[in-house]
Amino acid sequence: MKGLQVAFKQTLGHVVFDIELQLPSKGVSAIFGRSGAGKTSIINVISGLTQPEQGRIALNSDVLFDSVLGINVPVHQRNIGYVFQDSRLFPHYHVEGNLKYGVKQYDAEMFDKVVTLLALQPLLKRYPASLSGGEKQRVAIGRALLSSPKILLMDEPLASLDMPRKKEVLPFLEKLSESFEIPIVYVTHSLQEILRLADHLTVLDRGQIVASGLLSEVWSSQAMRPWQSFSEQSTLFNANIAEQHPQYALTRVMLSSTASLWVQKIDAPLGSDIRLQVRANDVSITLVQPQKTSIRNIIEAKVERVEKRHPAEDKESIAVKLALTQDCFLWATITPWALADLNLKQGDRVFAQIKGVSVTQRDIALTH
């Protein structure tokens, strides 16, 4: 079977793990959850740093652990790259020495590829003490890649960095899965990192899998509600760039074969694939198509579902799932007053309104 199969049972402290997980053979699979949910424990089991009481771990056709068959491949033979929260560089080696440390067979072409990808050339003769946090993490990622791993495990690699350093490293992480055809398991508690990087998302809580699947599916599911504030509830679209406005700084993106959206200008070629987030509280609903309005996006839709939500004791909101096309949905958040006034019901034909300026660069990521 292709991909990464993780199945194990284990008790660690007060957390009882009962994991059944299938992850794709390439791309970025994010593991998300609150502190103490067991995110790091899962990748430690995959790497072999922790041995479960029972279970099976396999990567494609390679069985790494099987309690029934008595298989437990040692850590150093699993061919796994591991990037920790802290860079763990050797202080007495310069960057080039750190990159080459542990490489079984030096490959000049591979070395140049990694150095170029992570923009490490200016750093090669410098020592870790002179590097910023972001530079250290880029070196740590490079060292892991140069071990020619079959899988890359990343344990919150940006957690120790301040916001400017995170912004420095994120573009390099976005290039990883495009440049290396290996699965990347990425542990994080950051919704923004998930939006920018992940293809697949697993939500974990107290050692149990709450949800696992394609990012766009899990993102809008009930499993994500506890982690999304009122302003963070949103819909994710896999879209592509269809048009650049000749006069204004706006880009039209296709959400489906017929539904499109004008957003703030995206500097990328026509046809580029992107991931797009539309916040639910940026979507309004009208029963009649407006004729003169400043809102650039008026999309005909059908009411698919109406849900009441209680984000706090003193607040109540209504989540409306709108079908733009048969397989393309958009969530809108409205007030109970608006629901009563519009008398919305399943099957009603309505118009969704989204300002062109409401979808900004932070809501858009070029996909692999």
Swiss-Prot record:
Residues 1-231 form the ABC transporter domain. It catalyses: molybdate(out) + ATP + H2O = molybdate(in) + ADP + phosphate + H(+). Keywords: ATP-binding, Cell inner membrane, Cell membrane, Membrane, Molybdenum, Nucleotide-binding, Translocase, Transport. It is a peripheral membrane protein. Its main location: membrane. Residues 292-363 form the Mop domain. Its EC number is 7.3.2.5. ATP binds at residues 33-40. Belongs to the ABC transporter superfamily. Molybdate importer (TC 3.A.1.8) family. The complex is composed of two ATP-binding proteins (ModC), two transmembrane proteins (ModB) and a solute-binding protein (ModA). This is Molybdenum import ATP-binding protein ModC. It comes from Vibrio vulnificus (strain CMCP6).
